[in-house]
Amino acid sequence: MQKKTQRTILFLLGPTATGKTDIVINLCDNFTNTFEIISVDSVQIYKDCNVGSGKPDDEILKRYHHHLINHIDLNDTYNVARFISDTTTLIDNIFERGNIPILVGGTMMYFNSLLRGISDLPGRNTNLREELEQHDTNELFQILQQECLETSISINSNDRLRIIRAIELNRENPFSAKSIIKLDDTLRVIQIGISPRLRSSLHEKIAIRQPFLANDKLINEAEHLLAKYQIEEHPIRKAVNYRQAFDLIEGLINNSEFYEKTLFATRQLAKRQITWIRGWEDLNIFDINKYQDIEKFLIRELKL
């Protein structure tokens, strides 16, 4: 087993539809018994969310185990603090097996928080949550403005879930001295970003991929989720592709609008992901059409 100071992990991050899964599978094929994959995806973490999340199929998942895919069901809610806790434990276990963790995905906030750390915030207060649920969203936002104006400025006045959580955190005094949870500072982190040189190249890839995500199978999947789980206020309601599917089922949009709205939302997601990448420090960026260069880079960096 490597000494702690020599431990290396890999980040492979990039916008949607850039072939990140194909890259790590190729690496696993070319360097057997070397890497273990940790998924960094806030939707693929959930069981039953398969079509709309672009989750690798069962055959791929059986052959190449992905940690943190199908990790919990929609009766539960995942967040960045749980991701950091789960991932740091996984990384230690992977090192114990003598392998290299490779974190791959497009949930940039998870990557960033793992690197930079977050405050060890208090858990939810059930009694307080029940009290707050009695208010409508406008009243809740007024409460937040009165109790913590600075926080209210950064939150959409219609985002009920975030408003409630902000009030909870403020009342639980998260601003007192708290430990910061993050990656071990002694780890060597090799960060690889995939980004298009031309936006049109990514839009083309999105257009090719989107019919496989936004189709009748997605509608059936969304209907199944609504029947199986209580998800009225679950974050999955806002996830790209699922949001549009739920809107279609509930009559908020029609069939002719559905596909175009998923396509637009996916492009907007990719735009936000690229914005993250452009401001990322210590990131080795590769064009989406230069996948072979990533392997050459890793061979050199890891001395494979």
Regions found by a protein language model. Name each.
Residues M1-L304:
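Phosphate/pyrophosphate-binding catalytic cores of soluble transferases and nucleic-acid-acting enzymes
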